[in-house]
Amino acid sequence: VEALQEAYNAGQRVFGESRAQELTAKQKVLPSDIEWHFIGPLQSNQVKDIAPFIHTIHSIDSLKLLQEVNKQAAKHDRIIRVLLEIHIAQEEAKHGFSPDECRELLYNLLPEALPYIRICGLMGMATNTDDTSLIKNEFHNIHELFTELKNSVFKGDEYFCELSMGMSHDYPIAIREGSTMIRIGTSIFGEREY
């Protein structure tokens, strides 16, 4: 919390957190004008805890989770921005929709069915590797999907504009491949203590 307060004092206003319990604890003690982004795996039963204040959820990986976010946002009469997580990495441990699952969801989703969410883009995590060509290819693939959706399902939708990809170890590649939002933690705050 002290490191976040220090970053806040230096002018930072957008913060991401990958654990729901830690996010709610930090939100209670840090300044109220912080724009909180949730960037980790999210379970449906955790949505109610972050719904009152969360700005953007980067890690939507199922229709069930989308529906729960909509339900909890409705209880607070607010719209929550979401990004659909796309599984682009070689690792099985990573979460997200396959590109085909994403297309199927979006082509069949009626926006009026989820009035309290706003789909603003996609999020992806590349394979954790030193192979920069593999990382570049994975980011390139998600950017192609983003462009395809921007020109079809979201044609004319000014809100569908975010491509969240790139972390401390691979953000330069992500930026070159079209990222609009990078998630930097380790490079600023050091290794996380679990």
Where are these regions (language model features)?
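Conserved alpha/beta-domain cores
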Residues: 1-169, 175-177, 189
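Gly/Pro- and small hydrophobic-enriched strand-loop and loop-to-helix capping segments
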Residues: 179-194
